[in-house]
Structures are given as C-alpha cells and as structure tokens.
C-alpha cells in the first residue's frame, strides 16, 4: 500500500497534469457506475465510457487549468482569498461544467438536439451544485495542496457524478428527483413477483 501511494505521489510530482486528469476521470466514471448499480438493471458500459470521455477530454483538463489560474489570480489561503476563489469557481466555473457535461453527453449519445438536456436541466442542476460544491471547494482551497486539487475535486466529483449521471438519464437536475428515483426503484422491487 505504501509503495502504491509513493508511486502515485511521485507521478503527481513529475507529471501533475496527467496524474490529476486520470484520477479525476477515474473517480467521475466511478460515480456513473455507482449510479447504475443504484438504479438496478444491467450495466451500461457505453454510458460509462461517454462519462469518462467527457471527463478526460474536457472536465478534468479544464479543472486542472482553472484551479491553477485561480491560484495565480488569487494566491494564498487567507479567508478572504479563499472566499473569493469559491465565489469565482461557482459563478464562472460551475455553469461551464454543468453545460459541457450535458452538451458533451448529448453529442456522444448522438442526440439530435445536443442542447435539449442543458436547456431543460441546467438551472436545477446548477442550483443543486450550489448546495454541494462551495463546501467542497472551501476545503479544497484551504487545505489541499495545489498539485492535488484536481484529484480531490474528482474524488468529490464521484458523488456529484452519481447524481449528475442519474439526472442526465432520468432526473430533472434536482436532488429531489434523485431521491424519488431511489424510492421508485424500491417500489418496483417490492412489486416484482417472486420467482420460484
């Protein structure tokens, strides 16, 4: 275990960008896999590949560049600086991440209107994100070293991706719809006739 951690630390020190991008994409894709397990039914590996593609091609790379730009523009860990970073991240970064997820997934799924999901779910998803991401980024900007910030965001993105992937497939972008889906799954399991 120690050698694995040492290898990861060396990789992040030598190649911080690719190491962070791969960790982010792995966590984000894992969130989609968890969402599929929670929904029940067969695994949809094509959907997970689409999520991984959006994460590697855009989200993780943008996140790495964005967090480094924020640190250059607003260096340090003073409380006012951290608050300014969180506000910038939510006001500027949040809308970009939500929009590109919905549009990117629609492109990869071959939908005719690649902006339909974004138009229908953007505001609800963005507002839901405001209940989660400011707290994540507050910890990120105050405690996490810059070289690990994208990986940390990916780790926290595991839970977010679970919600986001459900929302993209069936929900409306609200946390309430995610809880409703869980209740529907339990109800459907109760209604299924037992096989003998």
From Swiss-Prot:
GO terms for biological process: mitochondrial ribosome assembly. Residues 1-16, 68-90, 168-196 are cytoplasmic. Signal peptide: none annotated. It is a multi-pass membrane protein. Pfam families: Mpv17_PMP22 (PF04117). The chain crosses the membrane at residues 17-34, 51-67, 91-108, 151-167. GO terms for cellular component: cytoplasm; mitochondrion; peroxisomal membrane. Keywords: Membrane, Peroxisome, Transmembrane, Transmembrane helix. It is found in: Peroxisome membrane. Residues 16-55 are annotated as: Targeting to peroxisomes. Residues 35-50, 109-150 are lumenal. Belongs to the peroxisomal membrane protein PXMP2/4 family. Participates in reactive oxygen species metabolism by up- or down-regulation of the genes of antioxidant enzymes. Protective against the mitochondrial apoptotic cascade. This is Mpv17-like protein.
């Amino acid at each position: 275990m120690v050698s694995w951690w040492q290898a990861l630390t060396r990789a992040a020190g030598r190649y911080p960008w690719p190491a962070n991008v791969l960790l982010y994409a792995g966590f984000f894709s894992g969130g989609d896999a968890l969402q599929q397990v929670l929904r029940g039914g067969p695994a949809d590996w094509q959907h997970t590949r689409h999520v991984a593609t959006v994460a590697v091609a855009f989200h993780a790379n943008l996140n790495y560049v964005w967090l480094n730009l924020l640190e250059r523009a607003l260096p340090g860990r003073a409380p006012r600086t951290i608050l300014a970073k969180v506000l910038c991240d939510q006001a500027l970064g949040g809308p970009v991440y939500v929009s590109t997820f919905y549009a990117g997934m629609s492109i990869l799924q071959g939908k005719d209107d690649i902006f339909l999901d974004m138009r229908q779910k953007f505001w609800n998803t963005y507002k839901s994100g405001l209940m989660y991401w400011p707290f994540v980024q507050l910890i990120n900007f105050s405690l996490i070293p810059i070289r690990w910030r994208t990986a940390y965001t990916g780790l926290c993105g595991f839970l977010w991706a679970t919600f986001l992937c459900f929302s993209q497939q069936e929900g409306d972008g609200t946390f309430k719809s995610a809880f409703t889906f869980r209740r529907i799954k339990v109800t459907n399991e109760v209604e299924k006739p037992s096989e003998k």
